[in-house]
Amino acid sequence: MSRAKRIALALLLVAVGAYGQNARIPADAVDAFHAALKNKDTAAALSLLDRGLVVFEFGVVDPTVEAYALAHLPLDIDIAATTQWKLESRRVGGDGSDRWVISSYRVTGTQSDGTPIDQTMLETAIVRRSGDRFRIVHLHWSTNDPTYQTSLKRSGAPKAR
């Protein structure tokens, strides 16, 4: 990664605390994250992610918030901008500072190449209380749609490390 990219990312990560959102209950952090993606608001999305974030996304691992911010966050923003995510079911659990939010969504719309999307997306989010707000420490997305899986491989998405 270039020095300029590292500096820009560091400045963005330092600034994200200002956005903090109003994620006072676990599901608020997840919903605010999805809204930030849909609105193409990188700073707001990052403000909802804990510094210890690990993302599992369709067989690919982003082991740090920095790796996610550089590799997959831009792709997730692009997809969110052209799709609609309808919440179908949700369960929330855990206690103390660590909670989990398990959701299924019906995702419809188009990919950036115009390919239609109509699938069920499964999401597991683990959130942790940070002061009076919750931040996401782990995300795991999956779908059993083989066409979508194939399109991700063709798009040049980074492979699992």
Region locations from a protein language model:
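Short, cysteine-centered beta-strand-loop-beta hairpins and adjacent loop/turn segments enriched
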Residues: I79-A80, V107-D118, D145
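Short beta-strand edge/turn micro-motifs at domain boundaries
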Residues: T120-T150
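A short hydrophobic beta-strand element
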Residues: S97-V107
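Bacterial N-terminal signal peptides that target proteins for export
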Residues: M1-A8
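Short, low-complexity N-terminal intrinsically disordered segments enriched in polar/charged residues
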Residues: L12-G52, R154-R161
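A short, structured loop/turn motif at beta-sheet edges
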Residues: V92-R99, G114-T115, V127-R135
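Solvent-exposed loop/turn segments at secondary-structure junctions
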Residues: G52-L53, V60-D62, V107-G109, S142-P146
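A solvent-exposed, acidic/Ser-Thr-rich amphipathic alpha-helical stretch
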Residues: T42-D95, D118
